[in-house]
């Protein structure tokens, strides 16, 4: 497989990476916000920071406008629906908000955001080292924001 073929196949998978990573990090933000006993607005803010923070910083550093979540505003509705559904589920099921519950969505989001962020930087004609760094920034910055709040 040539590098252009590999890049093309990654481009086709990009929306799937973004979808799975965004949902996974939104869930990690939801769980962290619930562990801190934040109200509904706080839950949405923390979930949004986790889901969109790394990609937003990546877009700023790569000078991409509009930001991915502005360009695809459906993600905001997905985030709101996910927050409402998760809050209802956690309340009805008395879901245990353990550290272990945070590990799965966090790990999935890290891997997928790193792959997706790297691919976006490569598509923007960035050198390989810069692309890898953009992948790391995309993967970790949302979690950093989630943990700070």
Language-model regions, residue ranges each:
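Structural signature of hydrophobic alpha-helical transmembrane segments
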Residues: 9-22, 67-81, 127-140
């Amino acid at each position: 497989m040539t590098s252009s073929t590999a890049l093309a196949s990654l481009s086709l998978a990009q929306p799937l990476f973004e979808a799975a990573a965004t949902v996974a990090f939104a869930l990690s933000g939801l769980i962290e916000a619930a562990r801190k006993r934040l109200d509904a607005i706080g839950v949405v803010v923390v979930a949004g920071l986790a889901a969109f923070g790394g990609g937003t910083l990546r877009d700023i550093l790569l000078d991409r406008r509009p930001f991915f979540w502005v360009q695809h505003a459906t993600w905001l509705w997905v985030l709101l629906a996910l927050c409402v559904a998760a809050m209802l589920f956690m309340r009805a099921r008395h879901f245990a908000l353990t550290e272990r519950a945070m590990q799965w969505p966090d790990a999935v989001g890290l891997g997928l955001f790193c792959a997706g962020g790297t691919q976006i930087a490569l598509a923007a004609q960035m050198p390989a080292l810069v692309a890898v760094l953009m992948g790391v920034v995309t993967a970790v910055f949302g979690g950093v924001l989630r943990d700070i709040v």
